[in-house]
From Swiss-Prot:
This is Amino-acid permease BAT1. The keyword Transit peptide does not apply. Gene3D superfamilies: Amino acid/polyamine transporter I. It is found in: Mitochondrion membrane.
Length: 516
């Protein structure tokens, strides 16, 4: 009994919890996620089945298989630089606030409140837009599945109205909010299931679809055919190619979820960065396989994009449907394959709400949101329950813009990519400028390459911000104008105005809750 009989038991905190306390926060959420669970949430939000399937038309229209095959690796490589820089910062600051907390720490005392404010609002609005976009895409996919199941566009199939689609969207969000009200241990299991579903789904579809197809593209076609027949008045090869990159960049986003889940992840200073990097890396590999497999079933691009085909112009749905119909005389197998994708999209939306709610919880914990005390409330299951339902409600309201104008909805959805990547870039640029000599890395460090990778990441975000703002059709009219710059400028104007007239007087950046 060498230490004496009055020794009391002292619980051992893991490295992530120790670091959280050093940063000024007490543990309020249940820390129960493994490194695989952390990865699974980001991987499920990236969800190559979701992003590629729902935006395949864009890649096919702008450059075809060449843009899809080569553009995916180009966008993926630069996105990995963004992810590596984020992972390094995450290792040093593993909190649910993620990006906005990083900005505050890296900007220094003078600029911390403003940097934190702008990063936080771009991040959370971008996340809400992602959820709105994903669940609306699922509602549209369900509509296409119903259309094909009832005979297709040319066989008297049922196509729901815009109000039906928005109703489905609302129902999906309601289910996602219910699921996210469950304990984190349950969400961890569902997240792991979602990751496995995405992995297996990609493997099955990338092999099955070209195998079943009676007409296959040649390898030369897949790797060299450049489609310029976009019907949108754009003829420049370079311009067409960069517009086609939008599919890839839209897909590989949302991996900041691993950072937002760090307060619920064991050894978060190590496993948070691993979650970010592995989610991006595995998504790049599996996404390319999915693109390649599907592209071997592409033989007539104009027909796939035509709104007069059975799926109403939904290219991948038409590919799946025709593959089975031409082989077996029935497109039922193709509809089942679309069901596999739909489940992946469902998981993607669910994980998006999980990430949204943790960001809202952390941002309100620091007093940045209206009615902050309400949104950072944690229930008996250690779940930020009010933030969950807030995220679902706002995402639903965002999708309501589709009833007024699809152009307005597309502008809002564009914030899902641009808003998030601007939020990604702010802490990185602070890391390589103001904090270049003061930043102290955590267990994961890029070492001497940190500055180079950081600058590459920043330049890539600037590049894609320009690309997403380019006109996508000529001549430019009110219907064809790309309203992305307007949407982003509007968000900047609102957040800066809020700051100048109100928040600068009371928002000081992240607030310690150790003593509360």
């Amino acid at each position: 009994m060498g230490l004496g009989g009055d020794q009391s038991f002292v619980p051992v905190m893991d490295s992530g919890q120790v670091r959280l306390k050093e940063l000024g926060y007490k543990q309020e959420l249940k820390r129960d996620l493994s490194v695989f669970s952390n990865f699974a949430i980001s991987f499920s939000i990236i969800s190559v089945l979701t992003g590629i399937t729902t935006t395949y038309n864009t890649g096919l229209r702008f450059g075809g298989t060449v843009t899809l095959v080569y553009g995916w690796f180009l966008a993926g490589s630069f996105t990995m630089c963004v992810g590596l820089s984020m992972a390094e910062i995450c290792s040093s600051y593993p909190t649910s606030g993620g990006l906005y907390y990083w900005s505050a720490m890296l900007a220094g005392p003078r600029w911390a409140p403003l940097a934190s404010w702008m990063t936080g609002w771009f991040n959370i609005v971008g996340q809400w837009a992602v959820t709105a976009s994903v669940d609306f895409s699922l509602a549209q996919l369900i509509q296409v599945i119903v259309l094909l199941s009832t005979g297709g566009r040319n066989g008297g199939g049922y196509k729901g109205s815009d109000f039906v689609v928005i109703g489905i969207h609302g129902g999906i969000l309601f289910i996602h909010a219910l699921l996210n009200s469950l304990p984190i241990s349950v969400l961890s299991f569902i997240g792991q299931l979602a990751a496995l579903w995405n992995l297996l789904g990609v493997l099955v579809l990338m092999i099955l679809i070209p195998l079943v197809s009676t007409e296959r593209a040649t390898t030369k076609f897949v790797f060299t055919n450049f489609n310029t027949d976009n019907g949108l008045g754009i003829t420049s090869y370079a311009y067409i190619f960069v517009l086609g990159l939008l599919m890839s960049q839209y897909t590989i986003t949302g991996y900041d979820a691993s950072a937002h889940m760090t307060e619920e992840t064991v050894d978060a200073d190590k496993n948070g960065p691993r979650g970010i990097i592995s989610a991006i890396g595995i998504s790049i590999l599996f996404g390319w396989g999915y693109i390649l497999g599907i592209s071997y079933a592409v033989t007539d691009i104009p027909s796939l994009l035509s709104e007069t085909n059975n799926s109403g112009g939904y290219a991948i749905a038409e590919i799946f449907y025709l593959a089975f119909k031409n082989r077996f005389g029935s497109g039922t197998g193709g509809i089942v394959c679309l069901g596999v994708v739909a489940v992946a999209v469902f998981f993607c939306g669910m994980s998006s709400v999980t990430s949204n709610s943790r960001m809202a919880y952390a941002f309100s914990r620091d007093g940045a949101m209206p009615m902050s005390p309400l949104w950072h409330k944690v229930n008996s299951r250690e779940v930020p329950i009010n933030a969950v339902w807030l995220s679902a409600l706002i995402s639903f309201c965002m999708a309501l813009t589709s009833l007024g104008s699809i152009v307005a909805f597309q502008a809002m959805v564009s914030i899902a990519t641009i808003g998030l990547y601007i939020a990604y870039a702010i802490p990185i640029i602070l890391r390589v400028t103001l904090a270049r000599n003061t930043f102290v890395p955590g267990p994961f460090s890029l070492g001497k390459y940190g500055m180079v990778v950081g600058w590459v990441a920043v330049l890539w975000v600037v590049t894609i911000s320009v690309l997403f703002s380019l006109p996508v059709a000529y001549p430019i009219t009110a219907e064809t104008l790309n309203y992305t710059p307007v949407a982003v400028a509007g968000l900047v104007a609102i957040t800066l105005s809020y700051w100048l007239f109100s928040a600068r007087h009371w928002f000081t950046g992240p607030i310690s809750n150790i003593l509360s």
